[in-house]
Amino acid sequence: MSSTPNKHADYPRLVADIGGTNARFALETAPCVIEKVAVLPCKEYDTVTDAVRAYLNQSGATGVRHAAFAIANPILGDWVQMTNHHWAFSIETTRQALGLDTLILLNDFTAQALAVTQTSSKDLMQVGGQKPVEFAPKAVIGPGTGLGVSGLVHSPAGWVALAGEGGHTSFPPFDDMEVLIWQYAKNKYRHVSAERFLSGAGLSLIYETLAAKQKAEPAKLMPSEITEKALNCESPLCRQALDIFCAMLGTVASNLALTLGARGGVYLCGGIIPRMLDYFKTSPFRSRFENKGRFEAYLAAIPVYVVLSEFPGIAGAAAALGNHLKNV
């Protein structure tokens, strides 16, 4: 929302990535220049306005007129009720309370998708494929606490991020083992989405299924425990769970690539994959990604990148704000 759209080149701009646990704030002091990043625990502030004011005081920022917040929520209107924290607020009332000319909110994964367009090559690790086709659609998928899914389509005004809830599409099992895991999940949940498996909790669910099948102990493990034991070769069952997780990610990523025609590349965000880069390069991900019968050659050409940048949500919020101010 903007009350005086004429002076839209002003810096610094306030950008934030707000989750259920922490709110990350920063200042964009020039195009694509992010400074003074700070992480504030959400629980220490009664309202989002209180957290913003605390950051502005802490950073010594003055003259901030424009802001964009990426938030772990769908943005469906002026009223925002966070699903994983108690903050609830009106965007317009918050803008007025902070004395801003502009305040826009966007879904956090939409922001991560936009950040892809500003990510330098040093913050990307390629896993197979050839060179991306310039201006072709890009697919963005991010397993973490949940499963974020987006896409980027080029327009005369620049890159447009597709806001959706693709992580909640139905998961398609590939082989007999995945059918068994899918059935185990189906017995626990009414609908088995891709996110049920391609998330931290999903990795635990895959392990739980394998442990139940083999009557192995421990019956359950945390995602970090599974990853650690798998990478340190301490548990064949954990390694199997991680292999299946990566194969499933290959299936879902290739489905998204085919749906979007993502010859501009597939970009993997989220907190899980960057913790196992060496393993991931040779994991079942890439072979499963290309295993699409008649479209194997089509997918073999598509590059996949692991995004390694530290604060993609903040960079994406800055990109969204820049796009907004260009067009008001």
Curated annotation (Swiss-Prot):
CDD domains: ASKHA_NBD_GLK
Alphabetical GO biological process terms: glycolytic process
A GO MF label: ATP binding
Classification via Gene3D superfamilies: 3.30.420.40, 3.40.367.20
InterPro entries: ATPase_NBD (IPR043129), Bacterial_glucokinase (IPR050201), Glucokinase (IPR003836)
Keywords, in A-Z order: ATP-binding, Cytoplasm, Glycolysis, Kinase, Nucleotide-binding, Transferase
Binding site residues for ATP: 16-21
E.C. no: 2.7.1.2
One of the Pfam families matching this protein, by short name: Glucokinase
Catalytic activity: D-glucose + ATP = D-glucose 6-phosphate + ADP + H(+)
GO cellular component: cytosol
Key word Hydrolase present: no
Disulfide links within the chain: none
Family: Belongs to the bacterial glucokinase family.
Name this protein carries in UniProt: Glucokinase
Organism: Neisseria gonorrhoeae (strain NCCP11945)
